[in-house]
Amino acid sequence: MVTSRYYIFDLFGTLITGSGAEIMYAEALNGLFPGLKHWNVNQYINTKDLGSAEMCISKALEYFNITATSEQLKKFEEIINSWKKEVHMYDEVEEVITGLKKRGAKLGMITNDSNIIAGFIEKFGLEKYFDVIISSYKVGMAKPDPRIYELCVEKLGAQMSEVIMIGDKLDRDVEPPNKLGMRGILYDPEQKNAYYPDRISNLKELLD
């Protein structure tokens, strides 16, 4: 049974589709700027508020001393916008989060995102359900930095031992919270990590 007064959720790949954002970044950046280490760019844009999508990638490339043409920036934005159209909220999400709220639970969210892919929380109306929402680019740090989990727990008014975090990535949503004293639960709908003991394949299991 999964019960708590406090829950923290990941966003992409847990509440909404789009866990492939970093793969999409990599393909887009490697295609347009061969040799660029996309992971460094991800880390940079995920921890800074840089404005529009085009401005965001432009500043990131400038930071890494790479000159981009207007055509390259336009193409990158087209790739991002095409990807955005495919993102949707998982069917069971509203039932689960409303069910938890009815039980008196306080809900938090921690998401590694940037100006480039911001806006999905508002698009799907998720903000009304969550007591605390932490976006990496707004606070200048990203998962798995321990401080971002500590910030969310503090804002929830909870103790580490009282909190359950649910997400689809072991290295960001499960193992770091466990080390801090929370309970990290892996959301694994495709059962890719069947060996992992503390996991769920459907968010509705949180209501069991």
Where in the sequence are the language-model features?
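Asp-based, Mg2+/Mn2+-dependent phosphohydrolase catalytic module
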Residues: 1-7, 17, 69-71, 94, ...
